[in-house]
Amino acid sequence: MKKMFSSLLAIFTSALLLSGSGIAVCAQGAETEISSADLSGAVLTIGEYEEENGTDISVLSNFAEGSYNYGDFLDANNTAVYNEFRKLVEPSTDKVTIELPVTVTFETSTSSASKFTDEDSTAFSQAVFGACKPGIDSVLFDYPEIFWLDSANMSISIGNDTKCSYSSSSGKYKWKVYTIIITPKYYDVYGSLADVSEYKEKLEDAVDAFAVEGATRYDTLKAVHDKISEFTYYDTAATFSDSPIGALVEPGVVCEGYSEAFKLCCDSLGIPCVLVFGNYNAEAKTAHMWNYVQMEDGKWYAVDVTWDDLDNASVVKYAYFLKGSVSFNTNHTPSADYIITQLTYPELSTDDYVPGAQPVYAQGDLNRDGSVGVADLVYCYNAVMGDEVKYSCDANADGRVSSLDITYMRKLLMS
């Protein structure tokens, strides 16, 4: 699965360009203005940093009701990046300017980037990439329709409003970054932005035409799983192997394409689904990707369409369909560390999903979402006020729905 690793490291090879013109300066306390601060000509890549320092850096789906999005777990700066980058569902190569809610700071031993030590470069790359890469990665995980973005060639520059000062007490130069500018680029396989738009339309048409039938969520997901397997095949050499294009438009795909296509179809059907990265082997430079999907019982189950279709046979397998952690994790290991970015996955059910089994809900889980919380109290209140609801709100089991059920739910939530 070497192509998965290449995709994983794509953003690691994106050039980080530091603006060298008009860098502002400031003085505060024991700090002295540095009018000669020079960042011109400095070029860094995340790949070089990862190679030298390792990867341990802390730092409608599409927002349909009940969905799970990695963008919900970001800090303020990366949320700002996320909100700008998700607009790229409409392809564009225009520069994206992000005003950072929280000033990014780092210290160096010199005011000239050309004289940065390894320690200076590390401090710089940690600060800047930590403020933007998790946001970019989360967008690409939450929005697989941004299939065209070649993060390997995205230039990232800091704004001309960056300031530098010298601290006599520490003997260090302190930098303050207020703005990050990122220039998107499409993969070379697309000759122009017009080509990107053409394939975007083809993908949308394929998803819209992806008719599946099923009386239950299980039946629907099984149909999605089967149709993807029947349409495409595993092929590392295919033109669109690491894209949902290869799973839904032009056959030939690897794990990224399988899982992204599965998520796109689930998104269109309103079924919560996420991409999961794992089986990461840094030495062998391999990795894998699959899906977690939420069923009506509120629990999450694993689906690996790739491994159910590896032999390209006409017979569809279900060895990795709606599995719990006990069986699935024998050969699947999710990785929370997506090289700088930290991913927070939904908790996987322990047991495999059993179709037709009656789900058991916790006391107070009135809306049947798998958890007991304020949403259940609101659900109960709406029912008492006369709204039509799907599930019974007789929380105290007295045979009727009344204000006593609201009181019961309040006590339950406070206990």
Tell what function each PLM region has.
Residues 2-26:
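Sec-dependent N-terminal signal peptides of Gram-positive bacterial secreted proteins and lipoproteins
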Residues 19-25, 358-415:
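Cellulosome-associated attachment modules in secreted, modular CAZymes
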Residues 26-215, 331-361:
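N-terminal accessory/pre-domain segments preceding catalytic cores
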Residues 77, 81, 132-135, 199, ...:
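Stable alpha-helical elements in mature extracytoplasmic
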Residues 188, 193-248:
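Secondary-structure boundary elements
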Residues 194-197, 214-219, 253-257, 371-375, ...:
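Soluble non-cytosolic domains of exported or imported proteins
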Residues 208-212, 226-234, 263, 267, ...:
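Sec-exported extracytoplasmic/periplasmic mature domains
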Residues 257-328:
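Hydrophobic/aromatic-rich core segments of domains that either
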